[in-house]
């Protein structure tokens, strides 16, 4: 059993205007959903000694502040730029996620930059609100945050684990567990990169 050092990830979550439309303008429904999501994410990261907290929630009530399109890499890039220029200067956080109601191309349900944690532009992720079951969406967020934290997919080189969090395809009955390979990837990321922003308790 690996012993991981205590780290803290303060999340900023932005719900796009499509989410506002999807939930009929009910911002309290979106807020409740996001809080439930973060509580699942927190639970999944606790074995790695990572405490995740929601440091801010933005709901784009009147309009999107970036162009949200079905090309996930373009949308993620735009969101990263916006986060770097706008959101970071407004409130401290370590990583920002855009929750979108837009259907993404190629049956993608999430995207994030590998090893991006603490970088002003690259510490971001994109998650589609792809299931009415909030736990399923939380697993996607946990998976994308894993990429930010240096984790690769559970596939090649004896790391296949179809039910694990970092499996390349979401399974219908997803596990809440990270594979040993994911834990090793995270440990390597901490050793090689030692991202400073996650050292501070919220």
From Swiss-Prot:
Q: Which SUPFAM superfamilies match?
A: Metalloproteases ('zincins'), catalytic domain
S-S pairs: 118-197, 159-181, 161-164
- Cofactor binding annotation: Binds 1 zinc ion per subunit.
Residues forming the Peptidase M12B domain are 7-202
Q: Summarize tissue expression.
A: Expressed by the venom gland.
Active site per UniProt = 144
One GO CC term of this entry?
extracellular region
Query: What happens to this protein after translation, modification-wise?
Result: The N-terminus is blocked. Not glycosylated.
Q: Which cofactor does it need?
A: Zn(2+)
Tell whether Protease is among the UniProt keywords. yes
Provide the E.C. number(s) assigned to this enzyme.
Answer: 3.4.24.-
User: Which GO terms fall under biological process for this protein?
Assistant: proteolysis
Q: What GO annotations for molecular function exist for this entry? A: metal ion binding; metalloendopeptidase activity
Q: How is its activity regulated?
A: Inhibited by EDTA and 1,10-phenanthroline. Is also inhibited by endogenous tripeptide inhibitors pyroGlu-Asn-Trp, pyroGlu-Gln-Trp, and pyroGlu-Lys-Trp.
Amino-acid positions noted as binding Zn(2+) in the UniProt annotation, renumbered to this chain:
143, 147, 153
Quote any Pfam family the record assigns: Reprolysin
- What subcellular compartments does it reside in? Secreted
Please state the protein's primary subcellular location.
secreted
Q: Which EC class heads this enzyme's classification?
A: hydrolase
- Is tRNA processing among the key words of this record? no
Q: Which family does it belong to?
A: Belongs to the venom metalloproteinase (M12B) family. P-I subfamily.
Its biological function? Potent fibrinogenolytic protease which cleaves mainly the Aalpha (FGA) and Bbeta (FGB) chains of fibrinogen and slightly the gamma chain (FGG). Shows preference for substrates having a moderate-size and hydrophobic residue at the P1' position. Preferentially cleaves Ala-|-Leu and Tyr-|-Leu bonds. Is more susceptible to tripeptide inhibitors than TM-3 (AC O57413).
Subunit details? Monomer.
Give the protein name, as stated in the record.
Snake venom metalloproteinase TM-1
Which lineage? Answer: Eukaryota, Metazoa, Chordata, Craniata, Vertebrata
């Amino acid at each position: 059993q690996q012993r991981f050092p205590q780290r803290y990830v303060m999340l900023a979550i932005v719900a796009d205007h499509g989410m506002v439309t999807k939930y009929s303008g009910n911002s309290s429904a979106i807020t409740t959903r996001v809080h439930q999501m973060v509580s699942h994410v927190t639970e999944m990261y606790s074995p790695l000694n990572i405490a995740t907290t929601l440091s801010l929630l933005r709901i784009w009530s009147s309009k999107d502040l970036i162009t949200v399109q079905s090309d996930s890499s373009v949308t993620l890039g735009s969101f990263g730029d916006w986060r770097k220029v706008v959101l970071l200067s407004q409130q401290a956080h370590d990583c920002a996620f855009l929750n979108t109601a837009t259907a993404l191309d190629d049956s993608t349900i999430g995207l994030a930059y590998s090893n991006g944690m603490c970088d002003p532009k690259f510490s971001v992720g994109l998650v589609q609100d792809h299931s009415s079951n909030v736990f399923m969406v939380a697993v996607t967020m946990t998976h994308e945050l894993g990429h930010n934290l240096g984790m690769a997919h559970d596939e090649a080189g004896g790391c296949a684990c179809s039910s694990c969090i970092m499996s390349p395809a979401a399974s219908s009955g997803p596990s809440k567990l990270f594979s040993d390979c994911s834990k090793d990837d995270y440990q390597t990321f901490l050793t090689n990169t030692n991202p400073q922003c996650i050292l501070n308790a919220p």
